[in-house]
């Protein structure tokens, strides 16, 4: 389904009709950024730049209210909604996209202001889920490679679930399933686009929580933001200049999407990387040892996704890493780890985790502290540091191996968008530099742990025990009298 569009010049009329006021700013095309908000005169402190009525704020409460007006939408919402704010808002936007389509014929949906506003939103966003397959290959060797693949799988499963539910709802069956010519009022691509619009535009409001706010969602990001959003006593969402900012006529008005977001998260959610960000960090998935007999039990008990998080503050030499699962991964039965299936008070059976005879099921992510009760905690720390270092080294080598386009199975390089190539290259450069710094720091920590007197004594005793075992086995071999 082709997304309908309206020229941005028509936005002031739509805003006036729906009670949005922005007398001191205007929405305009910003070179290299798409749409943005610029001042329409010298701005004064404490004077709102924009005010949006609460009735236009799109959140879970607004979706529930809309469901009361549209029984057909309520059927769809009850069938596949109520999982999260995001899912409910996406279902609402899907209906508005269908209603706004000229090809729409099915008797579903009730028009509201968002039916028109969605026509002002971009037809694509430069987030990786909307890159072509060849463009997504540019992310090989970066932390986004697995994240984007997982997101694409999840989005496909989500839309399949929506369509499957729609098949039993007569009013929605024709909308979400292809016609004889193969077209449909809404497609998987529509769902992926709406997800991208949501992730790149959602705001965390002080009172209303996760919300999309028309017009305010046109404002671009800057680490040196000149404005911020809030909710006033009338529950309007307002845009205010920052107290320390001076915005001249014609200057772009910006807000901060979050100063601490890493490059991968910025690209994943917003489609760009802020080169002025002061924090470099990345998150990598972590796999348990293949030969660990307790691997499945550890994964089941841990529940969360096993990962390694590393970070570096550009303003200092300090680096940090964190991986709760790595600590669980590196302890075994001989250290004092045990899994037991016990019966609960209701007669059910539960997998419980024990560490040195103490039930630590509710502290499964706190083994960094729990290992202090081990005879040689520095030994386990050495194992963990080695595991994390090897995982980062593996990632670094992979990132470097795909740095050249010739190493990627891309069909036609000329079809790759420059924005995607530049973003992927910058992400790879940032993450490669970060990995090198953290690996070097981990090597220093590993050497220090290897020199620890308790570790040296333990490793020495293990070598002695192994030598004795080898000697004992040799003495038990029958003599050869030939």
Language model feature labels by segment:
Residues 58-119:
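Eukaryotic helix-linker segments that join adjacent hydrophobic helices
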Residues 2-56, 61-64, 109-482:
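Long, positively charged leader/targeting segments at protein N-termini
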């Amino acid at each position: 389904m082709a997304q309908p569009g309206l020229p941005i010049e028509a936005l002031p009329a739509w805003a006036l009709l729906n009670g949005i006021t922005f007398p001191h700013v205007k929405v305009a095309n910003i070179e290299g950024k798409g749409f943005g908000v610029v001042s329409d005169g010298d701005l004064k402190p404490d004077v709102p730049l924009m005010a949006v009525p609460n009735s236009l704020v799109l959140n879970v409460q607004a979706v529930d209210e809309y469901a009361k007006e549209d029984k057909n939408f309520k059927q769809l919402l009850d069938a596949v909604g109520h999982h999260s704010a995001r899912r409910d808002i996406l279902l609402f936007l899907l209906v508005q996209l269908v209603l706004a389509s000229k090809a729409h014929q099915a008797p579903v949906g009730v028009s509201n202001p968002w039916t028109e506003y969605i026509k002002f939103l971009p037809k694509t966003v430069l987030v990786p889920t909307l890159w072509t397959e060849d463009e997504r290959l540019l992310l090989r060797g970066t932390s986004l490679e697995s994240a984007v693949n997982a997101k694409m799988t999840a989005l496909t499963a989500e839309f399949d679930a929506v369509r499957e539910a729609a098949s039993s709802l007569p009013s929605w069956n024709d909308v979400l399933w292809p016609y004889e010519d193969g077209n449909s009022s809404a497609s998987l691509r529509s769902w992926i686009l709406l997800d991208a619009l949501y992730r790149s535009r959602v705001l965390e409001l002080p009172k209303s929580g996760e919300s999309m706010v028309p017009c305010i969602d046109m404002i671009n990001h800057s680490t040196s933001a000149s404005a911020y959003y809030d909710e006033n006593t009338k529950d309007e969402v307002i845009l205010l200049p920052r107290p320390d900012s001076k915005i001249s006529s014609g200057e772009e008005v910006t807000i901060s999407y979050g100063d601490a977001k890493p490059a991968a998260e910025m690209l994943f959610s917003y489609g760009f990387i802020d080169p002025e960000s002061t924090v470099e960090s990345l998150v990598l998935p972590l796999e348990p040892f293949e030969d660990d007999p307790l691997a499945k039990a550890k994964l089941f008990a841990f529940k969360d996704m096993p990962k390694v998080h590393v970070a570096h503050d550009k303003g200092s030499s300090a680096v940090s890493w964190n991986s709760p699962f790595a600590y669980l991964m590196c302890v075994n039965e001989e250290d004092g780890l045990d899994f037991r299936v016990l019966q609960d008070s209701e007669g059910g059976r539960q997998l419980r985790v024990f560490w040195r005879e103490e039930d630590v099921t509710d502290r499964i992510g706190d083994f960094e502290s729990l290992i202090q009760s081990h005879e040689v905690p520095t030994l386990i720390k050495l194992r963990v540091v080695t595991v994390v270092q090897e995982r980062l080294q593996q990632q670094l080598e992979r990132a470097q191996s795909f740095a050249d386009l010739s190493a990627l199975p891309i069909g036609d390089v000329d079809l790759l968008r420059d924005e995607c190539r530049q973003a992927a290259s910058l992400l790879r450069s940032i993450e490669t530099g970060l990995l090198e710094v953290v690996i070097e720091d981990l090597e220093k920590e590993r050497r220090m742990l290897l020199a620890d007197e308790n570790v040296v004594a333990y490793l020495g005793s293990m070598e002695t025990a192994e030598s004795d075992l080898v000697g004992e086995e040799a003495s038990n071999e029958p003599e050869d009298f030939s």
